[in-house]
Amino acid sequence: MSAQGEGGGAGGSGGGGAGSDGGGNAGQSSTGSGTVAVTNGGNSSAKNQLPLTPRFTAEEKEVLYTLFHLHEEVIDIKHRKKQRNKYSVRETWDKIVKDFNSHPHVSAMRNIKQIQKFWLNSRLRKQYPYRDGSSSNLSSGSAKISSVSVSVASAVPQQQQQQHHQQHDSVKVEPEYQISPDASEHNPQADTFDEIEMDANDVSEIDEDPMEQQQQQQQEAQAQAQAQAQAQAQVQSAAAEMQKMQQVNAVAAAAAANATMINTHQINVDQISAEKLTLNDLLHFKTARPREEIILIKHPEATATQIHTIPTQAQQHPMATITAGGYNQQIISEIKPQQITLAQYQAQQQQQAQAQAQAQAQAQAQAQAQAQAQAQAQQLAQQQLAAAQHQQLAAAVQVHHQQQQQQQAAVAVQQQQAAAAAAVKMQLTAATPTFTFSALPTVTAATTVPAAVPVPVATASSGSANSVAVNTSTASSVSINNTSLGGGGGNGATNSSATAADSFEERMNYFKIREAELRCKEQQLATEAKRIELNKAQDELKYMKEVHRLRVEELTMKIRILQKEEEQLRKCSTS
């Protein structure tokens, strides 16, 4: 024990001996059970003293136990829910105190500190019946017991306690609590959070209830270590909460890290287009992909039903699954083992007869699918052609507009320079300040719009005529703005408002263009995906054809074998 706890114990047994004895006798005469007595040292200064309260009676204990059990989810640090906060804890404790004090069986009013202390000790001594004790929760923001340094050292010497044990055999005796008499230590106004000292010796000496005998036997060996751990846990309950949160976060972070570790190389579609990917790149990325996503062609029966989908991770380029060489290699390696010896042919005769019918059906289905796919591809090609024509047309229109805009912009620049000069003259003659100078830089910036606009991309968004209309309208609106801006030459105020409108228009155009570019990219990706699907379908078809051819060969060989057998049988029968 630390010096502080010993000081408290010494003060209790020395100076306040009379008080503690009196409290003990009072409690034991009211009921046969001694639990918590808050006794005052006789020599401590009067202003810091708590009033002397009698011990809890058995009825009061029962009331408190039921209340604790009711609110256990909130007040118990071990079993509480995640979402609780310190305010809910505070309110719950206040509610417990109110319910306890308003209960008919209660003889004396108790305050929150006394009830919390009773909760703590009943948990510590394993007397709280509903759950076996664990670290208890004192960290409710309003009532911090830590400000009163409680030394849980027993004020009564150990021999005296053993006498108590002999007197009340079936009753658990709690050591009496001594508030340390130092005025500096026990000062409710000062918020000094001292450590709570616990004496671990008493825990193992409690008489064993027949109910709890097995528990006690198991726990007695651990009791001292537990009590010390609990003392620390009370001091550090807030820290423990923080640590729990951190641990949870750390675990989550680790899990996320593990998840990301699986896919180390992720190809970003924006960075690498399909054309730029070399074979080496593909081989390099192929090794890094998770095993499940690599498409393996297993058995011909499985492939027909199995639908190949593009993997869910969008940022990995789908081409990374299969290289041209690798895919063919797979097909060849799958086909080779099917060139089987005669003995195996004979073993598989019945199976193969069925399989041929299946294979023919599959081949027909595949042929239909292939035809559909080709039709789709043709449609796609036509659509793309149409879109390209639209793009060219729109680009021509836009080039024309840009030329117009540049001419208008040049005119506008001249007009603005004239206007600026006029405004400067106005400023020199009349001393009224105008905002010309602050507005001028934005004016010159705004006139550069038409050159900066990379318009031809915009049409790619929808391969239809209305996009052309949109572009022409935006372009014309820009040019209108420019001319109006030039016309408002007279004073600086109209000039600045026009520039504001112009910069807004410019921004709008920029965003429209960005949107169009993104749509174009989206379409490119979609067509890329379709192309890949088409390639897969074609490859599968090749594979199926090959398998079918081999099967047909097998069956022809079988037919020959059967014919030879028949001939032999006939010879045998004739002979």
Curated annotation (Swiss-Prot):
DNA-binding region: 48-128
GO MF term list: sequence-specific DNA binding
Complex and partners: Self-associates forming complexes of several hundred monomers.
Organism: Drosophila melanogaster
UniProt keyword terms in alphabetical order: DNA-binding, Nucleus, Transcription, Transcription regulation
Function, in words: Involved in transvection phenomena (= synapsis-dependent gene expression), where the synaptic pairing of chromosomes carrying genes with which zeste interacts influences the expression of these genes. Zeste binds to DNA and stimulates transcription from a nearby promoter.
Coiled coil segments of this chain: none
Gene Ontology cellular component terms for the protein in this record: nucleus; polytene chromosome interband
Skewed-composition ranges (Polar residues): 31-51
Region annotated Disordered, chain positions: 1-53, 151-174
GO biological process: one example: heterochromatin formation
Name of the protein in its database record: Regulatory protein zeste
Compositional bias segments (type: Gly residues): 1-26
InterPro entries (UniProt xref): Myb_DNA-bind_5
Ranges annotated as biased composition (Low complexity): 151-164
Subcellular location per the Swiss-Prot or TrEMBL entry: Nucleus
